């Protein structure tokens, strides 16, 4: 085994230990649970799509102790024309969020600032990371009581409350932000048979990276806070490989009867494949009960 192969194997081992999941193989999965409230569990599952490139979906799913607090850190990063940028986000975005001095007092502001700092760094490192980009949806569960969700792009977060699906993210579609894009000097294409695209290229209006389009794109996240009470049953984070073929309520209904979070995530991914999704698919499920 060469030195390069040994280093690669060490990196993959570290990723598995800290709860990161991403692979060029056909499927990858994992699970974990809170030490604070053992009934809160998480599971994830990834399936590579049919495109002839490396897997571009990356996942974070882990619990982390910070001083006397416990944080659940969950994320989906869906790359486009890049696996380096979602991989970078896996390693650095939560780290940057938690570095913000006002995180505990004002998590929404801290997250917005960290998203901006992280995107700026990605653009500065374009020679190394490439000129592609990535969507993101992140969820931070603070002491099993408060959930702070942020997103850019079309990776989505949905919470199930008393059997009803409630979106905690916004799909940043180009048509929804057409005025802002045009004010920055860009345009939104609407060709027959195709989705709306920024400058005729990108199907989302907000993303990390995409240096060649950045003047016309935003990386400012939509942020929302949800208190986890007795009504909260579970949370789903997923890339658009799932949401292209399944509505929020269909996804919730599909796993209501599945107690194990990892099995629930796998079921959703497999159902998306059965519905002819050809994209990379990544799913995180967090069970609150």
UniProtKB/Swiss-Prot annotation:
Keywords: Hydrolase, Magnesium, Manganese, Metal-binding, Protein phosphatase. Residues 41-288 form the PPM-type phosphatase domain. Mn(2+) 2 binds at residues 78, 240, 279. It is an enzyme of class 3 (hydrolase). The keyword Cell membrane does not apply. GO terms for cellular component: cytosol. Pfam families: PP2C. Its cofactor is Mg(2+); Mn(2+). It catalyses: O-phospho-L-seryl-[protein] + H2O = L-seryl-[protein] + phosphate; O-phospho-L-threonyl-[protein] + H2O = L-threonyl-[protein] + phosphate. Binds 2 magnesium or manganese ions per subunit. InterPro entries: PP2C, PPM-type-like_dom_sf, PPM-type_phosphatase-like_dom. Mn(2+) 1 binds at residues 78-79. Its EC number is 3.1.3.16. One of its GO terms (molecular function) is protein serine/threonine phosphatase activity. PANTHER family: PROTEIN PHOSPHATASE. Belongs to the PP2C family. This is Probable protein phosphatase 2C 39.
């Amino acid at each position: 085994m060469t030195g390069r192969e040994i280093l690669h194997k060490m990196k993959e081992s570290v990723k598995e230990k800290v709860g990161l999941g991403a692979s060029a193989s056909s499927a990858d999965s994992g699970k974990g649970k809170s030490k604070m409230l053992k009934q809160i569990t998480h599971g994830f599952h990834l399936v590579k799509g049919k495109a002839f490139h490396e897997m571009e979906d990356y996942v974070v799913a882990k619990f982390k102790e910070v001083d006397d607090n416990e944080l659940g850190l969950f994320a989906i990063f869906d790359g486009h024309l890049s696996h380096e940028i979602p991989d970078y986000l896996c390693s650095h975005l939560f780290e940057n969020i938690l570095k913000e001095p006002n995180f505990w007092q004002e998590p929404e502001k801290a997250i917005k600032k960290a998203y901006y700092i992280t995107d700026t760094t990605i653009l500065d490192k374009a020679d190394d990371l490439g000129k592609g980009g990535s969507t993101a949806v992140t969820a931070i569960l603070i002491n099993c009581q408060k959930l702070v969700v942020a997103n850019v792009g079309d990776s989505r977060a949905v919470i199930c409350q008393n059997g009803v699906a409630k979106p905690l993210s916004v799909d940043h579609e180009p048509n929804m932000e057409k005025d802002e894009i045009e004010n920055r000097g860009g345009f939104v294409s609407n060709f027959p048979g195709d989705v709306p695209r920024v400058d005729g290229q990108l199907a989302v209006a907000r993303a990390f990276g995409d240096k060649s389009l950045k003047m016309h794109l935003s990386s400012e996240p939509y942020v929302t806070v949800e208190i986890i009470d007795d009504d909260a049953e579970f949370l789903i984070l997923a890339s658009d490989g799932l949401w292209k073929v399944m509505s929020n309520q269909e996804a919730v209904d599909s796993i209501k009867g599945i107690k194990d979070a990892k099995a629930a995530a796998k079921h959703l991914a497999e159902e998306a494949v059965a519905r002819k999704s050809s994209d990379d698919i990544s799913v995180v499920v967090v069970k609150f009960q």
